[in-house]
């Protein structure tokens, strides 16, 4: 991953804090920032954040030699624009290797957000439900309120995450 600017890094840190808050309520998950993901023997990436199920039928990858091997369940990256070559390459690569959800934030005012979900081998963009919340399938009960994320209202985001994790998870 290319070196991040200060504003990109701050946004990534805030989003990582939110995903890690979810992890604290959800045993059995690895959540790491800037960890290497070996997608195949020839191809690897270092995303902004990786989340993977650590056991059971939803587990998609292994941790060996301090590296994720295989496609994690969830990846998050921060870029400046949708035209960024690294974003386009990563999106295609993560889709091809089976990353279930790829969340991309764009450092702007308001924050831009593209939530990709794997569906029949292709990514489709996820829209919020009627209540304005995007509900992850890769990370059961991770709820992110779109407007609060766009406005960088991290307290509202954390409150929504806590509401989500208080529900019975659907691991189907």
Region locations from a protein language model:
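Gly/Pro/Ser/Thr-rich low-complexity, intrinsically disordered segments predominantly at protein N-termini
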Residues: 1-172
């Amino acid at each position: 991953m290319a070196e991040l600017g200060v504003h990109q890094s701050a946004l990534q840190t805030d989003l990582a804090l939110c995903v890690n808050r979810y992890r604290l309520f959800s045993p059995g998950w690895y959540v790491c920032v800037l960890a290497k993901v070996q997608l195949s023997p020839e191809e690897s990436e270092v995303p902004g954040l990786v989340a993977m199920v650590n056991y059971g039928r939803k587990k998609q990858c292994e941790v060996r030699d301090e590296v994720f091997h295989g496609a994690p369940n969830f990846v998050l990256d921060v870029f400046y624009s949708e035209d960024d070559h690294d974003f386009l390459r990563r999106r295609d690569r993560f889709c091809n290797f089976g990353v279930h959800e790829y969340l991309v934030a764009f450092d702007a005012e308001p924050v831009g957000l593209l939530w990709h979900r794997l569906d029949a081998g292709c990514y489709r963009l996820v829209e919020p439900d009627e209540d304005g919340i995007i509900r992850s399938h890769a990370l059961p009960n991770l709820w992110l309120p779109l407007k609060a994320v766009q406005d960088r209202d991290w307290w509202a985001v954390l409150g929504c995450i806590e509401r989500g994790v208080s529900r019975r998870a659907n691991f189907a």
